[in-house]
C-alpha cells in the first residue's frame, strides 16, 4: 500500500512548502488547515504518518494526538510534531504521549523527509504485526473447545500421554486433536505454535 503524509498546520505557507518538498521526493501528501478538519474525515486508510504543528489556532497538535488516541478506530499512525519554539518539557511530554519525533523549525529538508520515511516504515511494521495478531486470533477462534484445551496443554509442554491422562481421553484422540490444532493454526510443529501464541 502507498501511504500519504498528512500535514496539519494553520500556516498555509508551511503546508504548501512541506507539500511541495514531499511531492518533489515522490511522496504523496495531503494538507489540513486545522485538526478538526482532519478529525472530521478520520480514519484515513492511506495515512502513513502525521506531521502536526504544536501550536495552532483552535486545536493544538498535542490535543489532536490525544483526540486521535481516544478514537475507537485503533492504531494511530506515527506523529511528528513541528515547533517554532525550543520547548524541552513539551518535547518530552509529547514523546511520552506517543509522538514519533519532535522537530524544531526551521528544519533541514532532508531531515524531515528522512523522519517521515522512518515513521512510515515503523507504521507499516506495526500494521503487519496487528494483521498477524488478528490472523492468529481468527485461527484460534476456529478451534473447538477440546482442541483449545489440547493446545493449552501442548503449550505447557505436556506429551500426548500426559494430555490424555489430564483430559481423561484416549491417546489416539489427543493425537487427532493435536494434528487438527497444528493444521488449523498453520503451525508445522509445537515451536511454531509457541511463537505465534
Swiss-Prot record:
4-aspartylphosphate PTM sites in chain numbering: 53
PROSITE patterns according to UniProt: HTH_LUXR_1, HTH_LUXR_2, RESPONSE_REGULATORY
Signal peptide region: none
InterPro entries (alphabetical): CheY-like_superfamily, Sig_transdc_resp-reg_receiver, Tscrpt_reg_LuxR_C, WH-like_DNA-bd_sf
Name the UniProt record assigns to this protein: C4-dicarboxylate transport transcriptional regulatory protein DctR
SMART domains found in the cross-reference section: HTH_LUXR, REC
The record's account of how the chain is modified after translation: Phosphorylated by DctS.
Response regulatory domain ranges (all copies): 4-120
Organism, as annotated: Rhodobacter capsulatus
One term under GO cellular component: cytoplasm
Sorted UniProt keywords: Activator, Cytoplasm, DNA-binding, Phosphoprotein, Transcription, Transcription regulation, Two-component regulatory system
Domain of life: Bacteria
GO biological process: phosphorelay signal transduction system; regulation of DNA-templated transcription
Transmembrane portions of the chain: none
Function text: Member of the two-component regulatory system DctS/DctR involved in the transport of C4-dicarboxylates. DctR functions as a transcriptional repressor of genes for C4-dicarboxylate transport.
Amino acid at each position: 500500500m502507498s501511504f500519504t503524509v498528512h500535514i496539519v498546520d494553520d500556516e498555509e505557507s508551511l503546508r504548501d512548502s512541506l507539500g511541495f518538498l514531499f511531492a518533489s521526493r515522490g511522496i504523496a501528501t495531503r494538507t489540513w488547515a486545522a485538526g478538526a478538519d482532519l478529525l472530521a474525515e478520520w480514519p484515513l486508510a492511506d495515512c502513513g504518518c502525521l506531521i502536526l504543528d504544536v501550536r495552532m489556532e483552535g486545536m493544538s497538535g498535542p490535543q489532536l494526538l490525544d483526540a486521535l488516541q481516544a478514537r475507537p478506530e485503533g492504531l494511530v499512525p506515527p506523529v511528528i510534531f513541528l515547533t517554532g519554539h525550543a520547548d524541552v518539557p513539551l518535547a518530552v511530554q509529547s514523546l511520552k504521549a506517543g509522538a514519533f519525533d519532535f522537530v524544531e523549525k526551521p528544519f533541514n529538508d532532508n531531515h524531515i523527509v528522512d523522519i517521515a520515511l522512518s515513521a512510515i516504515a515503523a507504521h507499516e511494521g506495526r500494521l503487519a504485526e496487528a494483521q498477524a495478531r488478528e490472523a492468529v486470533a481468527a485461527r484460534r477462534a476456529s478451534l473447538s473447545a477440546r482442541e483449545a484445551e489440547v493446545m493449552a496443554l501442548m503449550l505447557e509442554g505436556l506429551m500426548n500421554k500426559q494430555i490424555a491422562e489430564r483430559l481423561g481421553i484416549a491417546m489416539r484422540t489427543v493425537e487427532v486433536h493435536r494434528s487438527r490444532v497444528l493444521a488449523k493454526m498453520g503451525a508445522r510443529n509445537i515451536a511454531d505454535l509457541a511463537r505465534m501464541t
